[in-house]
């Protein structure tokens, strides 16, 4: 090998190590899970959930409906209350034909439930209070398949064909509510 080839190989190695260092830096600086939630256009993975009163629900049963999914841990269920209230009002003001196309799905990560009976009782009470069935992800299968962010509020819209049309985690700013409304109404018509 001559000096020219060694110099070229050395430059390539430095460039490669620079790229690796940059990728590692991005990985370190990006909050855990920020890049992980499902992407727009991806097929929604199947799921199987159970409510506090043992009602079972699967994605297959929701085909043909727009799924508005809120997934949170016990400590983060209130993070997106403003968005939930906004969407509840939007839903209530829509004609029946639009309401029938939208399924509002509230899921709580229940993987760490120490007392299933207590958790289920609380899900039943909260479901009655909110007038909507809340489901538990008892096994963590949905959490893993949907690449949910841990200890955060996750919000996903799935279209009638089972394709993810919106996905975000953390608090969703009020400035995005109108765009979410527009998307939902477009999907329903």
Model-flagged regions — what are they?
Residues 20-31:
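Bacterial N-terminal signal peptides
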Residues 48-66:
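A short beta-strand-turn-helix
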Residues 32-36:
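Sec/Tat signal peptide C-region and signal peptidase I cleavage site
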Residues 1-14:
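N-terminal secretory signal peptides that target proteins for export/translocation
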Residues 60-83:
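Short active-site neighborhood of thiol/selenol oxidoreductases, capturing the structured segment around
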Residues 151-189:
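Thiol-/selenol-based redox modules, centered on thioredoxin-like
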Residues 76-126:
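Structural microenvironment flanking redox-active thiols in thiol-disulfide oxidoreductases
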Residues 103-107, 117-152:
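Short, internal strand/loop/helix patches
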């Amino acid at each position: 090998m001559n000096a020219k080839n060694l110099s070229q190989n050395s430059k390539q190695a430095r460039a490669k190590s620079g790229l690796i260092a940059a990728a590692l830096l991005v990985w370190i600086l990006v909050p855990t899970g920020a890049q992980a939630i499902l992407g727009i256009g991806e097929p929604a993975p199947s799921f199987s959930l159970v409510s506090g009163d043992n009602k079972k629900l699967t994605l297959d049963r929701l085909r043909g409906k727009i799924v508005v999914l809120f997934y949170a841990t016990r400590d983060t269920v209130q993070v997106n209350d403003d968005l939930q209230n906004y969407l509840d009002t939007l839903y209530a003001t829509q004609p029946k034909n639009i309401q029938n196309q939208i399924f509002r799905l509230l899921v709580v990560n229940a993987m760490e439930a120490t007392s299933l009976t207590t958790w289920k009782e609380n899900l039943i009470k909260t479901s009655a209070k909110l007038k909507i069935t809340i489901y538990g992800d008892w096994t963590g299968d949905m959490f893993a398949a949907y690449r949910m962010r841990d200890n955060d509020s996750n919000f996903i819209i799935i279209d009638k064909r089972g394709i993810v049309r919106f996905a975000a985690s953390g608090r969703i700013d009020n400035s995005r509510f109108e765009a979410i409304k527009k998307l939902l109404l477009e999907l329903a018509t």
